């Protein structure tokens, strides 16, 4: 594996050890002859700001999902990546250490600041920075506390409708949506709506295209052979939702397992869309490190909207997907 060191940075090995991520690094994914970011990186949230890709994810590779820090990965083409420290849970005043750092999501608020939504202690918190590179400064309290709304409080996300209205998304076992404040630091719990979506497990995501709303999510546990991404379509966020249909499922023929927990992003100024999702760490022999559910990697693929309003199913492959921005 060939890696390129950033200035004032040591070259990392391929052991994928997890540390505090005190230094940025650069890596070229072409050396892998595969699509994924080379580190164990799960629960991806891909965003585009100011002509660059920004990827926020769970730093995987720790037993029992026990990572305690977040990084941000930055690229111009989905191949060459830089990594910067985003948030360490030791800096979060309400973190007790009972659960790790999971499932971050990013949004730019109405003031132009960047808000990182994240899970710790099975609660959802926020942290703020002036740039998407971070580092992010955590707020003093979580915005959704453990045990509220009758579901496991994980997997935050944000949907911004065409009129600028912001919605907060979250849930495990049941999907929830609620109006989100312009500063993206509070939600209106009195207007929260619980959605019944197939066999919803986690990672609710919403996007809009051609006047239709698309809700997508993961079903089953990440270690389950039936773990997959499904979606439904509606003309209104209130429903009714048609579906569900499969969007991403595992490809045992290519030894690609654990495909799920995604997000979807539009390339500004185009009708091109990208889906980011994780899978078990791949090995061509069929031996993979990710069978325990704690060793996952993030991959990317184009997402196509079909004329009938459906989404073309994404079929996991071994191979590169490179999409330079500004082209």
Task: Enumerate the language-model features and the residues they cover.
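Carbohydrate-active catalytic/glycan-binding domains of CAZyme proteins
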Residues: 1-327
């Amino acid at each position: 594996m060939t890696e390129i060191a950033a200035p004032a940075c040591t070259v990392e090995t391929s052991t994928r050890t997890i540390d505090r991520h005190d230094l940025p690094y650069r890596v070229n994914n072409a050396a892998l002859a595969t699509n994924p970011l080379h580190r164990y990186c799960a629960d991806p949230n891909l965003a585009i700001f100011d002509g660059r890709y920004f990827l926020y994810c769970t730093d995987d590779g720790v037993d029992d999902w026990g990572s305690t820090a977040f990084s941000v990965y930055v690229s111009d083409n989905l191949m060459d990546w830089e990594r910067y420290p985003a948030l360490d849970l030791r800096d979060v005043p309400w973190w007790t250490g009972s659960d790790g750092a999971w499932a971050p999501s990013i949004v730019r608020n109405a003031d132009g600041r960047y808000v990182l939504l994240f899970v710790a202690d099975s609660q959802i918190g926020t942290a703020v920075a002036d740039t998407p590179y971070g580092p992010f400064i955590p707020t003093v309290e979580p915005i959704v506390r453990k045990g509220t709304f009758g579901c496991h409080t994980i997997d935050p996300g944000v949907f911004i409708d065409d009129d600028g209205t912001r919605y907060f998304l979250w849930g495990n076992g049941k999907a929830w949506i609620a109006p989100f404040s312009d500063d993206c630091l509070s939600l209106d719990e009195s207007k929260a709506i619980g959605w019944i979506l197939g066999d919803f497990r986690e990672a609710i995501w919403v996007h809009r295209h051609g006047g239709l709303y698309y809700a997508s999510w993961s079903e089953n546990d990440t270690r389950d052979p039936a773990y997959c991404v499904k979606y439904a379509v509606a003309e209104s966020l209130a429903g009714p939702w048609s579906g569900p249909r499969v969007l991403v499922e595992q490809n045992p023929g290519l030894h690609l397992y654990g495909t799920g927990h995604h997000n979807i992003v539009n390339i500004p100024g185009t009708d091109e869309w990208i889906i980011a999702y994780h899978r078990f760490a791949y090995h061509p022999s069929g031996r993979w490190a990710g069978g325990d559910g704690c060793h996952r990697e993030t991959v990317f693929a184009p997402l196509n909207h079909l004329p009938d309003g459906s989404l073309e199913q994404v079929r996991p492959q071994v191979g590169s997907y490179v999409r330079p921005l500004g082209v």
